Amino acid sequence: SVDYQGKPTRVFAYYSDPDLLANRPHGKKKYAGVVLLHGGAGWAFRQWVEKWAAEGYAAIAIDLCGNGPEIRPLPDGGPNLGDDEAVFMQAENGDMKRSWTYHAVSSAILAHSLLLSMKQVDADKTCLTGISWGGYLTCIVAALDNRFKAAAPVYGCGYMDELKFFDYGMSKLSADGKARWMRDLDPSVYLPYVGIPMLMVNGNTDTAFDVPQYQKSCRLIPQHFREVCIRPGMRHGHYEGWEPAEIRCFFESAVGDGYPPIRITDVSLDDSLRVSFRTGIFPYSAEFYYTNDTLSDNAHRVWHTVGGTLNREKGTF
């Protein structure tokens, strides 16, 4: 990858595809590809790669902490996500090429280039997904690398100066340092330039990425590209972040033969709430999930659910 402190770096990755998984030679068949970006306390997860390979994709997961196999530091690895100095404090001195974000974004784009160079990968069908800090990166990379055809950041969003979870880093910055972070490293700067379909996935009571800032981030994405999936009770973690079937279904709609997600086309509120939607499939059931709790923090906010009348044929609820 790109130089760090004047020296070349290498990045460890796991790669697999349906042929490798089945222990057979590559033939003429080309597969859709996916780049996988882990979050904090994570690494290049082999099982994540194998999960996507089992679902028909050529998948690559890269380590974003300068580590190699068995999570051991590489002698020529880049900065570590666990190092607050690399993640936050480079914004203080303005040396962005030493920041973790710069190196992680570069590594993700180069991993995509590697994927595209493989004869078994369909260059017109590559996707991107990341979890937590990897979701943060996905928001940035999707805006910078227009070779991707779809992206799905999980948890990660912009306006990190408003998210209390990240006070541990943001509070160390001066006013100028924080302004520099928000100008150069915050996803809110990049999301308006996303030019591919993007599915934003989060839980309603996430401990790090709050719903209000998530909503603001989603609205920065051009309307015809953005989809959002807020899952009730979704916990924060790597397994929880790669488990949602909505991600694969979304990618299938972008690079395969799948149906597009349900899209709400109109909302009216008087004595009742009425939602109109458009979809290529008939939903099995529907519920209205809401909160009027304005006092609790995001993780402890109380949500309620109420049923209604679903008309599959007319596309109303």
Set out the residue ranges of the language-model regions.
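N-terminal cap/lid segment of alpha/beta-hydrolase-fold proteins
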Residues: 1-29
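Gly/Ser-rich "nucleophile elbow"/oxyanion-hole loop immediately N-terminal to the catalytic nucleophile
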Residues: 25-30, 79, 83-132
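Short beta-strand/loop motif that positions the catalytic acidic residue
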Residues: 194, 200-202, 206
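Primarily recognizes the serine-hydrolase "nucleophile elbow" in alpha/beta-hydrolase
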Residues: 55, 109-179
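Cap/lid segment of the alpha/beta-hydrolase catalytic domain
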Residues: 44-46, 50-106, 158-169
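Surface beta-strand/loop "capping" patches
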Residues: 242, 249-290, 305-316
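Catalytic histidine neighborhood in serine/cysteine hydrolases
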Residues: 221-238
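Active-site glycine-rich loops that stabilize anionic/oxyanionic intermediates
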Residues: 31, 37-42
